[in-house]
Amino acid sequence: MAKDGFDLVIGLGVTGRSVIRYLTDQGMPVRAIDTRAEPVGLDALCADFPDLKVHTGGFKKGWMGKARRLIVSPGVAVSTPAIAEQVVDGKEVIGDIELFARAASEPLVAITGSNAKSTVTTLLGQVADACGMNPGIGGNLGVPALELLDDQARLYVLELSSFQLETTYSLSAEVATVLNVSQDHLDRYASFADYLAAKQRVYDGCQVAVWNRDDLATRPPATVARQISFGAHPEADYRLDSENGQLLCRGEPLLSLSELALTGHHNAMNILSVLAISDALSLNRDKALATVKTFTGLPHRCQLVAESGGVRWFNDSKATNVGATLAALTGIGESIEGKVILVAGGLGKGQDFSPLAEPARQYLRAALLMGEDRTTVAQGMSAAPCELVADMAVAVRRAHALAQPGDAVLLSPACASFDQYSGFAARGDDFTTRAQELCHD
C-alpha cells in the first residue's frame, strides 16, 4: 500500500459519511476532510467513529499528499486546485459510485439526465419490486449507493448526477440511460459540452443504452452494441402517439394515455423510458404496465397541492433548471383551458433563460419572479408578462389575485433555491402551505 496507506474522504455530507462507514467496515484506514469549519453532523460522526481523524475548515495538504487515494463527495469539484494537483501527480481520485461499482455483484440500472431522474428511478424501482427483484434503489436519490450493498438486492436502480459520474470509471451498467439534457450546473462546468460529457459517462461499459430520440444529446456512442430509444419521434422504439393518445412499442399499443394516473407530455416520456428499461431487463411486462398506470408521481414534481374556485396550484419546486420548467410549463399549459401563472426565480447558475420565452408567451397570464437572479430570468423571458416580487408570500398572494377559473398557478422556479431556502423541498413546502391556506380561506 502506497505511502501512509489511508483513504482520504473529502466532504462530510451524506455521501461522505456513507463512504467512511463503508471503508471502515472493510477494515481500511480512513481520514476525512471538510472545507466547512463546522459540518452538519460532525459530532455524531466522531461519536460513531472515535478513531477517525478529521480536519475541517480547508484542505490539509499533508494528508492530501500522503493518502493512497482520494474519495471525493459529489459536491466537491475535481477541478478544485487542491484536488486537481493530486490528479496531476497521478493519485487515484474516485467517488462513492466507483466504490459501489467495484463491489456490487448484481445487475445495475444507471439513470441520469438533467430532469426526471428521481421520478424514473422511483417508478422503475416500483416496477422491479412488483416483479420480485427486491431492488436496491438510491444513489443521488434517498439512500447512498454504498448503503445498498447489504440489502440482498437482485437488482440495483441508481439515480446518478453528473457530479457523481465525474469520478466513476468502471460503472458497466446492465442498462444505462440519459433521459434528457438541458443547461444546468454551468456554475460548476466550464461549458455545456463539459456537462454533457459528464452525463455521457453513464454509458461507459453498459450492455444496453436507453436514450431519448427527441433529444440527440442523449444518444449513446456507437460502441454500445444494443441501443433502445423512446420519445415522440416516429422512429423511436417506444413511442408516444399523441394523435391517438397511446404509448407504443415498435408500433404495437402498450396502453392508452387515459389509463395513466399522470398526465402531460413529460410524464408520458418518463413512463416510456421506464417501460423500455423494464423490457431490456426482461421484467414481466404485464406487471410493469399495471405499476405505471397507478403511479402518481413524487412530491415537488408537478404535484397538485391545492384547488379552489376553478384554479389548480402545482408545486414543481424540484425544477431547478430551465429544461425542467420548460417541460412543466408546456405540459400544464397544454392540459388546461385557462392560462398559467408561473412562480419562478432563485439562483440561476449561469443558465440561458431564453428557451422559456416562447412557451411563456403562449401559456402565461403572468410570471412572478423572485430571488437573486429574478431580473436575469425576466430578461430571458423577454416579452412575457413578468412581475418582480420580494418573496414567496408576495408571489402566492399576487398569483391568487391574478388567477381566473380554468387557470393553474405553477411553482416551477428554473433556479436553485439556496438564496432563500435550505433546499427545493423547503421552497416547495412554503409554496404549498401558503397556497393551501389561501384556498381554504
Curated annotation (Swiss-Prot):
GO terms for cellular component: cytoplasm. Its EC number is 6.3.2.9. It catalyses: UDP-N-acetyl-alpha-D-muramoyl-L-alanine + D-glutamate + ATP = UDP-N-acetyl-alpha-D-muramoyl-L-alanyl-D-glutamate + ADP + phosphate + H(+). Its main location: cytoplasm. It comes from the Bacteria. Coiled coil: none annotated. The keyword DNA repair does not apply. One of its GO terms (biological process) is regulation of cell shape. ATP binds at G113, S114, N115, A116, K117, S118, T119. It comes from Alcanivorax borkumensis (strain ATCC 700651 / DSM 11573 / NCIMB 13689 / SK2). This is UDP-N-acetylmuramoylalanine--D-glutamate ligase. Belongs to the MurCDEF family. GO terms for molecular function: ATP binding; UDP-N-acetylmuramoylalanine-D-glutamate ligase activity. It is found in: Cytoplasm. Cell wall formation. Catalyzes the addition of glutamate to the nucleotide precursor UDP-N-acetylmuramoyl-L-alanine (UMA). Keywords: ATP-binding, Cell cycle, Cell division, Cell shape, Cell wall biogenesis/degradation, Cytoplasm, Ligase, Nucleotide-binding, Peptidoglycan synthesis. The gene is murD. Pathway: Cell wall biogenesis; peptidoglycan biosynthesis. Pfam families: Mur_ligase_C (PF02875), Mur_ligase_M (PF08245), MurD-like_N (PF21799). PANTHER family: UDP-N-ACETYLMURAMOYLALANINE--D-GLUTAMATE LIGASE. It is an enzyme of class 6 (ligase). InterPro entries: Mur-like_cat_sf (IPR036565), Mur_ligase_C (IPR004101), Mur_ligase_C_dom_sf (IPR036615), Mur_ligase_cen (IPR013221), MurD (IPR005762). NCBIfam families: murD.
